[in-house]
Every structure is written in C-alpha cells, then in structure tokens.
Curated annotation (Swiss-Prot):
UniProt protein name: Outer membrane protein YaiO
Primary localisation category: membrane
Record lineage: Bacteria, Pseudomonadati, Pseudomonadota, Gammaproteobacteria, Enterobacterales
Keywords assigned: Cell outer membrane, Membrane, Signal
One annotated Gene Ontology cellular component of this protein: cell outer membrane
Cellular localization per UniProt: Cell outer membrane
Organism: Escherichia coli (strain K12)
Signal sequence coordinates: 1-19
NCBIfam families given in the database record: OMP_YaiO_dom
Keyword 4Fe-4S in annotation: no
Taxonomic superkingdom: Bacteria
Gene from which the chain derives: yaiO
C-alpha cells in the first residue's frame, strides 16, 4: 500500500512544469476502533495544479479495513476543481470512485458554492451524493459561514442527510483555525456532533446512531517548500447495538513548487 503511494508520488513529480503544478503530498492515516470494530489504514498521494482561474486536485488512495474476522482492501481515485468566477463567487466540484468495499464510499459527488458577500465573511452552500458499500445511498445538503478575524478563521457548518434506508439525520461542525504570525503554518481544531454517522468507513450499525468527534491538526513548515502535517482525533459512536470510539492519527508531507 505504501509502495503504491510512493510510486504515484514519483509519477506526479515527473509532470512537466507547464502543467501548473503547485504541490505534491504523500500521507498516511490510521484509525483504531475500540472493542471488536478493528482498524483502518489509508495511504495516499495527491497533487494540486493551477490553470488560470481554476485549481485542480487529484488524489489516489489505497486503504485497508480490518474487522474482527473480515478484511477488505480498496483503491480510490478522486478529483476536484475549484473555480474563481469573480471576486465574490467560487465553486468546488468533486468526484470520486472506489472499489465496492467498506473501506471507501463507492461513488462520491459534491458541488459547493462559496459566496463572499460581506467583508471578511464567506458563506457556503452545497450538495453531496454518496453511494456506500451494499448500495446505501445518502444525499446531503449543507450550509455554513466562515468569519475571518485577523489570524483566526472561525467556521460553522450544518448538514442534513437523507439516507436510502435510514431516513433523515443531521450534523453540526465548528472549526477554529489559527494562522502563525509568520510563514504558512497554522493550527486547526474541529468539533462536530450529530445523528448522521455517515463516514467513508461504512459500518451498518452506525446508520441509526449518533456521533461526536474532535480533531486537532498542525501544519508545520520545515523549509520554504516542505510542510509537515500532523493530525490527532477521536470520534464517539452511540448506536442501538453498541457504543464505541475511534482514535485517528495521521501524517503528511507536502512539497510546494
């Protein structure tokens, strides 16, 4: 899995300069679930390129999900396009496909619209369609706002989910980002809570449960071109059949051109 990711990163780095390549990232993500819920390993390579008013992202991921008695492997490819139409309108369009396993969502499409209608304020709305393992489909509509106050960015997002077999649910997410006084480093905290336990790791019993999570990330510049990202988080699931939690640890290296 790691070898495939490093190979993809090597291929990406060989792209010609005229493609507008701005960064290459290689990362690893590990989640350990309590009880007999196993663990999840994910390695990925990602590139970002700039073409006039558009920013393009390409990601190739390899994942493994280990349960107590079952094991699944999967590959996922995804892409996204951010387009700046003018000074107040930006859109994000994303699509992803993966193997039909519990590791990733099989299909994922999202469309976000960002509106800078007020000074130091960004409004966001969007739609997301996801098809999980075993043909479970989820439609999600979200809306939020971000406030820019000096080095601090505070964001709130509400999401409503409509599942093909579990009905409606929701989630609330708050994030606070503190930019370093100098350089490009920053620290970001996420807090979320809701009744829609929909994640890429699709576990059937979470369809009818609730969840809450906390995650802390540090982006630390090592040189002018190389950044190190470290993330630690925890999620708690409360389901009709079992209560359990997951501990997440992640690391990534990003080279900027």
């Amino acid at each position: 899995m790691i070898k495939r990711t490093l190979l993809a990163a090597a291929i990406f780095s060989a792209l010609p300069a005229y493609a507008g390549l701005t960064s290459i990232t290689a990362g690893y993500d590990f989640t350990d679930y309590s009880g007999d819920h196993g663990n999840r390993n994910l390695a990925y390579a990602e590139l970002v390129a700039k073409v006039e008013n558009a920013t393009l992202l390409f990601n190739l991921s390899q994942g493994r999900r280990d349960y107590e008695t079952e094991h699944f492997n999967a590959t996922r490819g995804q892409g996204a396009v951010w387009y700046k139409w003018n000074n107040w309108l930006t859109t994000r369009t994303g699509i992803a496909f993966a193997d039909n396993t519990p590791v990733f969502a099989r299909q994922d499409f999202r469309q976000d619209i960002n509106l800078a209608l007020l000074p130091k304020t960004l409004f966001t709305t969007g739609y997301r369609y996801t098809k999980y393992y075993d043909d479970v489909e989820v439609d999600a509509w979200q809306g939020g706002v971000s406030l820019y106050t000096g080095p601090v960015i505070t964001s709130y997002r509400y999401t409503h989910y409509d599942s093909s077999d579990a009905g409606g649910s929701y989630s609330n997410m708050i994030s606070v980002r503190l930019n370093d006084p100098r350089g490009t480093g920053y620290t970001q905290l996420w807090l979320s809570r809701g009744t829609g336990a929909y994640t890429y790791d699709w576990t059937p019993e979470t369809r009818y449960g609730s969840m809450k999570s906390v995650s802390l990330q540090r982006i630390q510049p090592l040189t002018e071109q190389l950044n190190l990202g470290l993330t630690a988080g925890k999620v708690w699931y409360d389901t009709p059949t079992d209560d359990f939690n997951g501990l997440q640890l992640a690391a990534r290296l990003t080279w900027k051109f």
